[in-house]
Amino acid sequence: MDIRQVRETVEMIEEQHFDIRTITMGISLLDCVDSDIDRAAAKIYQKITTKAANLVAVGDDIAAELGIPIVNKRVSVTPIALIGAATDAEDYLPLAKALDQAACDIGVDFIGGFSALVQKGYQKGDKILIESIPQALAQTKKVCASVNVGSTRSGINMTAVADMGRIIKETAKASEMGAAKLVVFANAVEDNPFMAGAFHGVGEADTVINVGVSGPGVVKRALEKVRGESFDVLAETVKKTAFKITRIGQLVGQMASERLGVGFGVVDLSLAPTPAVGDSVARVLEEMGLEMVGTHGTAAALALLNDAVKKGGVMACNRVGGLSGAFIPVSEDEGMIAAVQGGSLNLEKLEAMTAICSVGLDMIAIPEETPSETIAAMIADEAAIGVINQKTTAVRIIPKGKEGDMIAFGGLLGTAPVMPVNPHSSLEFIARGGQIPAPIHSFKN
């Protein structure tokens, strides 16, 4: 490595907001199953506090050694609906509290996996877990919840979509932060290190380390050096920058897995913004030549960015996974907030962008008077985009305040302007229930 590369790395960290967004330990809870919910809760607490006892300390040590900030240390677990189904309990709040107590005691930032996978219908534990979500998120500090309502192979469970529209409303009423910790997915992945949608898939090893990186500022600075150049040069520049970012993510993941004595899972190639100036995905798109995100050309710019990040990342690391794309959360990206306030970015344009990028309608505040059927219809639209395009999509939406208000979440969750919603009803559409069948191109065998 020559002196120029050393200088570039120092600049990435000190000036361009590069960091490791998260190291997330995935832990299987399948061996914690018990017919008694209190015994199951005790087993869950014991396993998490044993396996992840040193996660925070190891993360801090690696950050100090490498001089690279590791912003979050997190845990993801087996979807709790699977564990709860073995009990006769009618509420899974005790399991949520066990997760929360374990997370608090080991010092991690969040714990994900209060989750259910219902893309093709409800099993015993699924409905109970979903109905438990509002109070589970209201009565815990660090628990995150997710529900997968669709997949390319299964179609969309519209009964679950309707239920989740109602649950999001109830969750937002039950607590200030609850809805920000709840994600509704289509094509959810089993190795996602990012919250609030992380859970540990049943096909995963017993315990693994997954890493999520963050580098929008690094990409923007690289693009500043090629202003006026062709799209070919633009794509190559993003690709090379993503390579550097991912290499560091892989190094951190390998060091953490070795020191913790668990397997190394994946590096998630996502570009994750923060509310800080200089750490915005929106500003990367604007650096490509857009006056403001949301104008015509935004989707094309996002497509170039997303693809080039994947190509560079795959070259840098042979174990990539998770969501792996550009995140466009409104409240967590100062450029997105500015675009909404400037009238350039609306829900419909964000929805179009989700056909390309990672995840979907993320950290968006809408008026609290929005009917649950309208929220369900938003979920259905996002799920349809994911199911048809064979990609992960999601909705993390917060019904609070009235149009034009600013809702402050604090920390990495930022501040969201309350965005207008189409006033026309989707009630009769959502009331149908049942299943939207899988698309014809899902039949691969």
Curated annotation (Swiss-Prot):
Say which domain of life the source belongs to: Bacteria
What InterPro entries does this protein map onto?
A: UPF0210
Which cysteines share a disulfide bond? none
Record's NCBIfam families? PRK05313.1
- Subunit info? Homodimer.
Report the family membership: Belongs to the UPF0210 family.
Please give the name of this protein.
Answer: UPF0210 protein SZO_15840
In which organism is this protein found?
Streptococcus equi subsp. zooepidemicus (strain H70)
